[in-house]
């Protein structure tokens, strides 16, 4: 008979009441391999990895998606092969994990380096092997990565990890989203009024293509005109909008959004993005990343965190456009 759904599909309980894995009893496995013993159902790993990859692609079918396997969960050469064959990248956070993945034949373009205490040797290996990205976890890292990349004559792909202040479930002791925890760079400056981000609740149209978050129709302009008139603005104007508050069609909602953007502009995360941008000869900024917690079923938390990341993205692009209006910048 089958066991609880939490067990792999290949698990069952036989007539004698013994747990079996693909027909092999647990006792026979212990007799052959000894104890303690980890038993991994590779069919289950492959099936789950494939489902995650396909689900992400289907949910966000208007953009490119990457799903990463956290190497810290369990990393062996065979696991590396299975998850990458299923379409996943692999997150590594130590020299050992990096070496295991590379020994399994995983190319650098399928690997990511995480960690809040990276050694120079780990950064150097990631750059040499052309890792998909190095996730910047603290303000001093861009300078270190840039120095090593310059010495190697290469350009490193980097992504910034941001603590968004949104936490999706899980125990407080293992939370990775709060502003005062050890991973990532805070979105807001210390003591900032996070209540100003309530303007994000009114956003109705957030698209990867334009990245211009729109306020709902309830936000009427100062002169009483329909807010939908903003849709007629050309992209060049929109990129710095709503900082240009002198525009005749600026609404109260625009002003609230500008206030939120100004607060983000004063935050640590934006400062690090600007530092990376200044080093673009050796650093390629490929995106921002926020880990909000362990409860993957908390859809509202993911939506709120995504809105905050879009606000950071919009603020960064606005500042770059104002300072260098002719330069085109792409950030995912």
Please name every model-derived segment.
Residues 157-160, 164-188, 237-238, 242-244, ...:
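Phosphate/diphosphate-binding glycine-rich loops and adjacent basic-rich segments that engage nucleotide
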Residues 320-325, 329-332:
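Single conserved hydrophobic/aromatic residue that forms the stacking wall/gate
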Residues 307-314:
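Midchain, well-structured core segments that form catalytic/ion-binding scaffolds
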Residues 59-62, 268-285, 315-319:
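A structural motif corresponding to the C-terminal end of an alpha-helix
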Residues 238, 246, 267-278, 290:
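Conserved beta-alpha junction segments in alpha/beta enzyme cores
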Residues 297-305:
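Short glycine/threonine-rich loop-to-helix capping motif typified by GTGT followed
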Residues 1-157, 172, 193-207, 212-215, ...:
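A charged N-terminal "starter" segment
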Residues 70, 157-163, 289-291:
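Short beta-strand segments
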